Amino acid sequence: LKLTTSPVAVKLIPKGGEIPEGITRVDEAMRHCQLVDRVRRTGEEFYTLVEDQMCKGGAGAMGLGEMPPKVASGEFYFKGLKQFSTQGAARRTLEMVPKLPANSTEAIMYSPLEKASFTPDVVVVICTPRQVMLLTQAMMYKTGGRIESSFAGKQSLCSDGVVKVYKEGKIGVTVGCSGSRTYTKIADEEMIIGIPIELLADVASGLKEICPK
């Protein structure tokens, strides 16, 4: 596949669950998209609590705390970011964003896939469109079919890349959002693909067959 950065293993620890011994807490508050981008580049492994997540909209979507009222109502995207013609249009879009129940997640763990000390729920890969194509073809190698993608350019790495994949058990492809493309080093020519852990072995074996030798 010739990735230039690591696939990122992400695990959602349910409320009341225990954080494994030996994994350290992140050393500064950041957005989920920033955390994924940091891990893919630095090779660090850590966990985060709700207070470590700067973007409360992304954290709320992943069940870490609650969705901020101004985000859920559409006010933030309508009046703040001015990305919709009406607040109703913003609200409808946010209602459709994949999310977990509020306060259902205790912590979130991050690690480069190749050195993860835990079994992830989702593997997030940030790569070029061609590499997304190869990952898609690898997934299709065994049984065929199609990848169905759904996104709105909102809450991309959190909702589309993790929550949707976690809930549905299907691969998700997304294009990033204003936040993730502002606060990270994700390049204009990169996309995001989320792979549920249950399908990772099929993707890996398919890659061995279809990737150019």
Regions found by a protein language model. Give the residues of each.
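Acidic, serine/proline-rich low-complexity intrinsically disordered regions
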Residues: K2-K213
